[in-house]
Amino acid sequence: MVLRGVRVVELAGLAPGPFCGMVLADFGAEVVRVNRLGSTGENFLARGKRSLALDLKRSQGVTVLRRMCARADVLLEPFRCGVMEKLQLGPETLLQDNPKLIYARLSGFGQSGIFSKVAGHDINYLALSGVLSKIGRSGENPYPPLNLLADFGGGGLMCTLGIVLALFERTRSGRGQVIDSSMVEGTAYLSSFLWKTQPMGLWKQPRGQNILDGGAPFYTTYKTADGEFMAVGAIEPQFYALLLKGLGLESEELPSQMSSADWPEMKKKFADVFAKKTKAEWCQIFDGTDACVTPVLTFEEALHHQHNRERASFITDGEQLPSPRPAPLLSRTPAVPSAKRDPSVGEHTVEVLREYGFSQEEILQLHSDRIVESDKLKANL
């Protein structure tokens, strides 16, 4: 795999950091998740990782992490600005120990600025990026599209990109560097198309009344006779013509496709037509055409959809739980996600410490002093 041999130390945090670490692990990196002692939180995104339980509030725990980072390629930390410095684990310290270290800092607001030390969640980062103002139905409040955009798109995935870029640059310079990955800025960067197309008038109407935000009758969803939904994205004229054909409508009897003043009435007409058939019936009509009409699938339906099955787009883990296959698909060095169950907290404490150069005596002492936790050591005491 493409990241085979890359050592990553991931400090436990909420979803964006674990997702970043999971992507790295899926593509071959050796990821150690450092959990807090006594942590009972689920490792929802721990596939392919190993878990070390370590107390970073005590000086011995800080020393352990410094020794690990001296041998690691990447440190991934998800804390607010200043937390790592307070622990004496800031980039100045760790890069002095290991000049080749990639020090990845994933936070909501970044490492500087007036919001850098305050709490926030996906919706807050989405709001500050400007993107939230664009999402929502006409006449309604803005609403977040789950917590995908800022947490995972602008956060975890953008941080993963930063790490891979820094690793590539290190092959030239031999030096590590600090990655300041802000979810606000990552989300804003994802919205570059929106910014660049503003002068074209693509977003001149209020939220929910533009061509790509649900305002157009040919770019929205419609309810079917059985209470399900179909998604329509027939923007181009040739695709729009196929949409009308499938709906049994004549273009001569309708206003011009791009007559935005007529869109509300056209949406009502399209909705009336879609409501006359079930989702399955509409799939029979539109599947295999270029009308850009697809069913809105549930997770369960997505698992079993023929297209997704042909591409093996979903996999099962060691506990037979389904999840998406890692993407993108590389031809020579594809991801090989672990089929094992996700690790329990501290499950690999002993083996990880050994790999990072700790002697048996040191490990026993750390356990005795409650700097680390390990069920394996407990069983032997």
Curated annotation (Swiss-Prot):
Q: What are the protein's UniProt keywords? A: Acetylation, Isomerase, Mitochondrion, Peroxisome
Q: In which pathway does it act?
A: Lipid metabolism; bile acid biosynthesis; Lipid metabolism; fatty acid metabolism
The source's domain of life comes to: Eukaryota
Catalytic residues (UniProt): H121, D151
Which catalytic reaction applies to this protein? a (2S)-2-methylacyl-CoA = a (2R)-2-methylacyl-CoA; (25R)-3alpha,7alpha,12alpha-trihydroxy-5beta-cholestan-26-oyl-CoA = (25S)-3alpha,7alpha,12alpha-trihydroxy-5beta-cholestan-26-oyl-CoA; (2R,6)-dimethylheptanoyl-CoA = (2S,6)-dimethylheptanoyl-CoA
Any idea which positions bind substrate? R36, L54, D55, L56, K57, G120, H121, D122, I123, N124, Y125
| Chain span(s) of sequence motif Microbody targeting signal | 379-381
Q: Kindly state one GO CC term assigned in the UniProt record.
A: peroxisome
Among SUPFAM superfamilies, the record links this protein to: CoA-transferase family III (CaiB/BaiF)
Protein task: Catalyzes the interconversion of (R)- and (S)-stereoisomers of alpha-methyl-branched-chain fatty acyl-CoA esters. Acts only on coenzyme A thioesters, not on free fatty acids, and accepts as substrates a wide range of alpha-methylacyl-CoAs, including pristanoyl-CoA, trihydroxycoprostanoyl-CoA (an intermediate in bile acid synthesis), and arylpropionic acids like the anti-inflammatory drug ibuprofen (2-(4-isobutylphenyl)propionic acid) but neither 3-methyl-branched nor linear-chain acyl-CoAs.
What the record says about family reads:
Belongs to the CoA-transferase III family.
The name of this protein is Alpha-methylacyl-CoA racemase
| Native species | Mus musculus
